[in-house]
């Protein structure tokens, strides 16, 4: 199941920022739009799509991952095909809304929820592995899209992406996914099956409304939002921040490689830790890693320290996703995990959408991007303190 979920996660690539970025200049030239107009259309589409995440999550809970992912895959293929027809900024915003809603949002959610249902004791490591495989695969997507654009043009490239989704994500979802282990007479983690005359163990299943009244949900939301806000801002303005210490655009772009390595290491390590007793301290640790990243971003000048900053930023991003994915079902069960994940996803996307603007304003207020990074480090430090004080609201794992 981890392999299938990872594959579907990779197939969301054309709807992720890393995939859309390949089309940016071609959209600008082909539609005669400025970079600002394209960025605004992307922001509007992303923000509007985020508001649907809780509803999508509830529907996933109602119909199951298999059916939901199949529908989302087919709809995603259609929206990608629609991108080949766009004309003008408004139409482009509508297209961005569709691919962000279905690719970055819905399909990504079902791929994560599917793993949550199939693992309990080893859920953290399984989610960390899924994230690692997905990130590795998505990193290839821009290369393939760029080759398609060079060969056929950007409009045909959208159609090619739609075709790939239609012949892969849809059949994988329908024929590969199984909603729950019990549907095959199995149990999470591959444990022994339950005899017919024995009741299935009942795990706590908390509704979305109950979760929203939990302090743990809002602490985890604060960690997720802070990670999304500042992580996105640092990534978006990487050339600006590193340019202040003399790095060229090419040199700054090269630092994405240690960030990718850090994200893989962070996802696997924190996913493994999430299955152990230390997991109730992980939200605070994630916030501390982000604070350390921002302090390094404001002080690093030599190549070793810039390399350390880049790797630490990747660790912050990878660890945040692994901790969020593993703690949600540990806190609230899996009965309503789709709607709860959708609500947390809404918070994360909204924060992410404001990341670039926050650092732009910060550079004006504080005089530079490096200074802004230093001052903004105060917030994750406060979030880390809050998460440490209220760590008792997070479940311990006494088995390891």
Q: Could you tell me what each predicted segment is?
A:
Residues 1-35, 53-56, 142, 234-239:
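Extracytoplasmic
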Residues 10, 90-106, 225, 305-319:
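Hydrophobic core of transmembrane alpha-helices in multi-pass small-molecule transporters
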Residues 16, 20-24, 209-267:
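Extracytoplasmic gate region of multi-pass secondary transporters
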Residues 51-65, 266-278, 364:
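Helix-to-loop junctions at the C-terminal end of transmembrane segments
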Residues 67-81, 281-295:
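Structural signature of the two symmetry-related core transmembrane helices
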Residues 106-119, 319-332:
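Intracellular juxtamembrane helix-capping segments at the cytosolic ends
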Residues 129, 138, 331-366:
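A late C-terminal transmembrane helix in Major Facilitator Superfamily
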Residues 133-181:
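Helix-loop-helix hairpin linking two adjacent transmembrane segments in secondary transporters
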């Amino acid at each position: 199941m981890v392999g299938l979920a990872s594959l579907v996660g990779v197939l969301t690539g054309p709807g992720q920022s890393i995939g859309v970025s390949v089309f940016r200049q071609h959209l600008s030239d082909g539609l005669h739009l400025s970079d600002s107009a394209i960025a605004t259309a992307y922001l509007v589409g992303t923000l509007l799509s985020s508001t649907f995440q809780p509803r999508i999550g509830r529907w996933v809970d109602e119909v199951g991952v298999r059916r939901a992912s199949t529908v989302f895959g087919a709809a995603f293929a259609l929206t990608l095909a629609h991108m080949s027809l766009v004309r003008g900024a408004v139409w482009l915003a509508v297209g961005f809304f569709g691919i962000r809603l279905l690719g970055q949002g819905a399909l990504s959610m079902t791929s994560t929820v599917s793993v949550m249902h199939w693992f309990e004791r080893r859920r953290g490591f399984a989610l960390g592995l899924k994230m690692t495989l997905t990130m590795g695969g998505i990193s290839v997507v821009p290369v393939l899209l760029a080759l398609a654009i060079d060969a056929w043009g950007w409009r045909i490239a959208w159609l090619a992406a739609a075709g790939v989704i239609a012949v892969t994500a849809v059949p994988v979802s329908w024929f590969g996914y199984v909603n729950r282990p019990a549907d095959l007479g199995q149990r999470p983690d591959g444990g022994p099956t339950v005899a017919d005359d024995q009741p299935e163990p009942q795990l706590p299943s908390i509704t979305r409304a109950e979760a929203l009244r939990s302090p743990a949900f809002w602490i985890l939301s604060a960690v997720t939002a802070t990670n999304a806000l500042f992580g996105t801002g640092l990534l978006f303005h990487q050339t600006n921040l590193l340019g202040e210490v003399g790095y060229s655009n090419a040199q700054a772009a090269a630092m994405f490689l240690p960030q990718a390595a850090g994200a893989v290491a962070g996802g696997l390590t924190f996913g493994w830790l999430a299955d152990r007793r230390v997991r109730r301290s992980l939200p605070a640790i994630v916030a501390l890693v982000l604070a350390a990243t921002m302090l390094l971003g404001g002080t690093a000048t030599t190549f070793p320290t810039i390399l350390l900053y880049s790797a630490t930023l990747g660790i912050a991003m990878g660890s945040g996703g692994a901790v969020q994915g593993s703690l949600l079902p540990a806190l609230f069960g899996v009965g309503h995990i789709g709607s709860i994940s959708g609500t947390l996803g809404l918070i994360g996307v909204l924060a992410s959408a404001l990341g670039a603007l926050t650092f732009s304003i910060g550079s004006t207020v504080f005089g530079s991007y490096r200074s802004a990074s230093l001052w903004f480090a105060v917030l994750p430090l406060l979030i880390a303190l809050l998460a440490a004080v209220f760590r008792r609201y997070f479940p311990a794992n006494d088995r390891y």
